[in-house]
Amino acid sequence: MVIATASGYMPYEFVDITSSNQDVIGVDMALGDKIIEKLSDKLGVEVKKKVEDTTFTANLAAVAADQVDIMLAGMSPIEERKQNMDFSDVYLKAEQRIMVRKADADQYKDIDSFNCKTIAVQKNTTQEKIAQNSLPGVSVTSMEKIPLAVLELTTNKADGVVIESTVAQPYLIANTDLVLCDAELPEDVRYKDTAIAVPKGNEDFLELINETIKECQDEGLIDQWIEEYSSIAAEQNAG
């Protein structure tokens, strides 16, 4: 099973720097392993895993072109994407926040505080759309991966990063100079659903994926993975 992903999106997917093969690990990879396990049981043969770790933009193109079997990349199932791919049930819901330098946090009490400021985001993501459409008067810097967006913030090239709260946690643990500010995003964009994408026309596979998601949710595995991989990511990021 070929999995498209974009490492650097902790705790969903990131490179394990302690592994000899620089394996991609995280919440999404753990969920992918469960899907492979269920698919192997159904087919009666061992299904192998191949991870195509590129960029989020390349991931989207690969799924739309039916070049991969599945995309696990902390992705939101927005209507625009549904034209080119099918989505699983939602397996995680998270709040969208703005991460800033702790020293500047007091000046950001609402989204209007970011007028004439620079916001860094990951390219072709929900967060990019939020920055472009819901933050008045900001300049948007789009990077291929979220660590590069965070680097813009820590090197004073950006004033904030629109980021999912789950993804922010490893950075906040590893760097006490960063915080989530008090400014709340508009209600219609504040919360993000996360789902799995597959090429169109794979209804049976999608059904198996949804069964796996429900089993993992019922067993509390997804929450467990978030805690586990946030901790690992923070340790590696700090190191």
Predicted regions and their residues:
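Periplasmic-binding protein-like
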Residues: 7, 92-102, 127-131, 165, 169-229, ...
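Acidic, polar ligand-binding/catalytic clefts
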Residues: 44-113, 186-187
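A ligand-binding cleft/hinge motif common to bilobed small-molecule-binding domains
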Residues: 57-58, 72-84, 130-133, 154-155, ...
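Short, well-ordered beta-strand segments
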Residues: 2-5, 99, 118-120, 161, ...
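Extracytoplasmic small-molecule ligand-binding "clamshell" domains
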Residues: 1-72
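Bilobed "Venus flytrap"/periplasmic-binding protein-like clamshell domains
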Residues: 9-10, 22-39, 76, 97-146, ...
